[in-house]
Amino acid sequence: IVFYTFMGGFLAVAWTDFVQGWIMLITLVVLPLVTLSVLGGWEGMTETIANQTSNNQAALLLNPTGGRTGWTLLAGILGGFGVGFGYAGQPHLLARYMSIRSVGDITKSRSIAISWAVLAYGGAVLMGIVALAYFGPNYFTDPELMMPELAKRMFPSWFAGILICGALAAMMSTADSQLLVTTSSISEDVYHQSINPEAKQADLVKLSRIVTLIIGVVAIFL
């Protein structure tokens, strides 16, 4: 992560995030849909869950509101919107929108972002439900092992390895973005804007690379 951010800057991070985003999307969409098919579709999955849990638990799990009503439901909805506002305000995400080529591309970018989020987060929820049906409620002591184990059960080893890399891709895409934003904050916001407004672009690039390397090394040791 430090190497390609150091060498390529924003362009390298953008291209690697593009590839990583596709890996995550394929993992979160293909894996739960294949598992759902193995379980016999939606009806087969719900029947399996009902057999493994009490009727009340199964009803709550498959209920879009989770059994919440009234103020509890409203608080959950408002909390979800609150998370959405916070998500859109994260610096490493705003940097992506600030780099859009033109105002006309914002609409296209918005559609892509919303479509990706709906598919990815919807797939993540579905993956949890189908994993519960496939493995049972008490199979894992650590729920984070669910996705790798499900991938190994559903696909050949080589393809399962690619899907398991989806988790690594998620970590890398966040880490390189945070690294890039921190670097730009120090080199541009602090040094260029406050310390040396007359700094040349070549000097700023050198400083950015040095800061990237320092932050990466510190992060590794921490």
Label each residue range with its predicted role.
Residues 15-18, 99, 108-115, 164-167, ...:
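Internal alpha-helical transmembrane segments of multi-pass membrane proteins, especially GPCRs
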Residues 159-192:
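Membrane-helix boundary/coupling elements in multi-pass transport proteins
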Residues 187-222:
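Loop-to-transmembrane helix boundary motifs in multi-pass membrane proteins
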Residues 5-11, 41, 127-130, 134-138, ...:
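Transmembrane helix-loop junctions in multi-pass membrane proteins
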Residues 1-5, 79-86, 168-176, 208:
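Helix-loop-helix module between adjacent transmembrane segments
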Residues 1-2, 20-24, 28-31, 114-117, ...:
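Residue-level recognition of pore/gate-forming positions within transmembrane alpha-helices
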Residues 22-161:
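Loop-to-helix junctions at membrane interfaces in multi-pass transport proteins
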Residues 1-21, 96-102:
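Membrane-water interface regions at transmembrane-helix termini and the short interhelical loops
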